[in-house]
Amino acid sequence: MAKEDVIEMQGTVLDTLPNTMFRVELENGHVVTAHISGKMRKNYIRILTGDKVTVEMTPYDLSKGRIVFRAR
């Protein structure tokens, strides 16, 4: 997938699911299921309920995403 095809949105973590999956509410009100990106997993960045995150989504499936950044 080319980097230009990615949609980046801000959101808030609502719930923690098994296998490092999270339910994230985006700024526009949609709720998506997201997993942690590889670099965040490698650097042991913890994500908790209520954290503000940046989610990357592909235009082909807008119900799933990848968490690429956790705001402080």
Swiss-Prot record:
Subcellular location, record wording: Cytoplasm
Extent of the signal sequence: none
GO cellular component annotations of the record: cytosol
Span of domain S1-like: 1-72
Family from the record: Belongs to the IF-1 family.
Assembly and interaction partners: Component of the 30S ribosomal translation pre-initiation complex which assembles on the 30S ribosome in the order IF-2 and IF-3, IF-1 and N-formylmethionyl-tRNA(fMet); mRNA recruitment can occur at any time during PIC assembly.
Summary of the function given for this chain in its UniProt record: One of the essential components for the initiation of protein synthesis. Stabilizes the binding of IF-2 and IF-3 on the 30S subunit to which N-formylmethionyl-tRNA(fMet) subsequently binds. Helps modulate mRNA selection, yielding the 30S pre-initiation complex (PIC). Upon addition of the 50S ribosomal subunit IF-1, IF-2 and IF-3 are released leaving the mature 70S translation initiation complex.
Protein's UniProt name: Translation initiation factor IF-1
